Design a protein with these regions (language model features):
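Catalytic cores of nucleotide-sugar-dependent glycosyltransferases that transfer UDP/GDP/TDP-activated
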Residues: 1-143
Length: 143
């Protein structure tokens, strides 16, 4: 996706990442692609859900990321690549976070409370549309 954006020469205002499968994108956009003019000023929003996975991903994940020349301090959580630690890394490299589920784990909720970026708490489907618009305007684009 990132290379497609580069080929089209289209600089997005916001990139909204959903769930753990895309959770490494904020890290890569801020580090590996950090000097790309197309992403300068781009805001990254990550939505977090309660759909985690059991166990950990490949224990070599940190080695694979270091191969791309990214400083280990940027992904220190990934020494143990669990769902919680992958999402912590996404939060650390996002400009804003949205709680996409009402039942996040206690550990993830506690980490979100300490986040330095704006966090939109969960809203049910009847009210999330306006809440997202307001959040984007005031906290993401207005920040």
């Amino acid at each position: 996706v990132v290379d497609t954006v580069k080929k089209l020469n289209w600089g997005p205002d916001i990139i909204h990442v959903h769930g753990w499968l895309a959770s490494l994108l904020p890290l890569y956009l801020r580090t590996y692609y950090g000097n790309e003019p197309l992403f300068d000023g781009c805001k990254i929003v990550t939505s977090i859900y309660s759909q985690d996975f059991e166990g950990t991903l490949c224990q070599d994940l940190s080695k694979k990321i270091s191969f791309d020349g990214i400083d280990g301090a940027q992904y220190a959580h990934l020494d143990t690549p669990s769902y919680l630690n992958i999402m912590k890394t996404a939060i650390d490299h996002s400009d804003a976070v949205i709680e996409g589920s009402p039942d996040l784990s206690d550990e993830l909720s506690a980490y979100l409370k300490k986040a330095t970026c704006p966090v939109l708490n969960f809203h049910n489907k009847d009210e999330f549309s306006q809440a997202y618009i307001d959040f984007y305007k005031s906290k993401v684009l207005g920040a």
